[in-house]
Amino acid sequence: MTLEEKINLSETRVFKTVFPNNTNHYDTLFGGTALSMMDEIAFITATRFSRLRCVTVSSDRIDFTHPIPAGTIIELVGRIEHVGKTSMKVRVDIFVEQMYQEGRDKAVTGIFTFVALDENHKPTAILR
């Protein structure tokens, strides 16, 4: 399997509803909740790509460009952006759409770096 095929197969998509218990005082998705969801999707993507134990080592620039109101549907999309020897970068985008209208907007984008670990919790090669 080629690297591009492996990247395509590991792309992860999850849909969620934004309920009021996940919002802030502006009735939009709380940023910390968005980051938690993004890290989870990034973890799943990294694990599906490598099929190894993976841990988050950093979250790079996170851009919140569009509010995510309560009562909307979001899609989180995780995709491998770069593969190093023992680490990989995963881009996660959150798209928001109204429940009863067409269209959607990209609301949040972030890059997460993961390291693959062996059974001794030491960095291990991703591509063998």
Predicted regions and their residues:
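HotDog/MaoC-like acyl-thioester-processing domains
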Residues: 2-14, 68-70, 81-128
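Hot-dog-fold acyl-thioester-processing enzymes
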Residues: 2-55, 115-128
